Amino acid sequence: MQTTKNQDDLVRIFKSILKEERFGSQSEIVAALQAEGFGNINQSKVSRMLSKFGAVRTRNAKQEMVYCLPAELGVPTAGSPLKNLVLDVDHNQAMIVVRTSPGAAQLIARLLDSIGKPEGILGTIAGDDTIFICPSSIQDIADTLETIKSLFNYAE
């Protein structure tokens, strides 16, 4: 069993393990990480990581209480690129909706307002984590959508 893996590997595998939504206790997470080669991992380290990455206990599809990392609860850091704050971009025939990390919508909306009409954005309304974008022209909504997606390197 390998015991010297770097911190990036630990974080990547930790997040991968939580995405499985089958670990109900910290000791189960410790055992899974040890099985992945992190022999020096312990419960207190797992507890700190759960807190750092905003993990919560919730019910999975089998109605078991498990730890998970919901995307919308991801905590941005000071070094996070703006594109990491955009979680989803969608639209209908009249409006574009952007979902962001909590607290990031007004920042992203201000950026979108600054590029404004030349890029097809008439205006925005932002809450905490959702932005409604009114395109300058409904006929050109597809172009405006592509502009927004490319601005944040968003790919579905």
From Swiss-Prot:
Record's keyword terms, sorted:
Amino-acid biosynthesis, Arginine biosynthesis, Cytoplasm, DNA-binding, Repressor, Transcription, Transcription regulation
User: Which Gene Ontology CC terms are recorded?
Assistant: cytoplasm
Q: Does the keyword Repressor apply?
A: yes
Q: Name one Pfam family in it.
A: Arg_repressor
Keyword DNA-binding on entry: yes
Q: Name one GO biological process term.
A: L-arginine biosynthetic process
Look up the domain of life of the source.
Answer: Bacteria
Q: Which GO terms describe its molecular function?
A: arginine binding; DNA binding; DNA-binding transcription factor activity
Name the principal localization, coarsely classed. cytoplasm
The pathway where this protein functions is: Amino-acid biosynthesis; L-arginine biosynthesis [regulation]
* Annotated signal peptide: none
Stored InterPro entries: Arg_repress, Arg_repress_C, Arg_repress_C_sf, Arg_repress_DNA-bd, WH-like_DNA-bd_sf, WH_DNA-bd_sf
Localization (cell): Cytoplasm
Tell me its family: Belongs to the ArgR family.
Tell me, what does this protein do in biology?
Regulates arginine biosynthesis genes.
Could you identify this protein by its name?
Answer: Arginine repressor
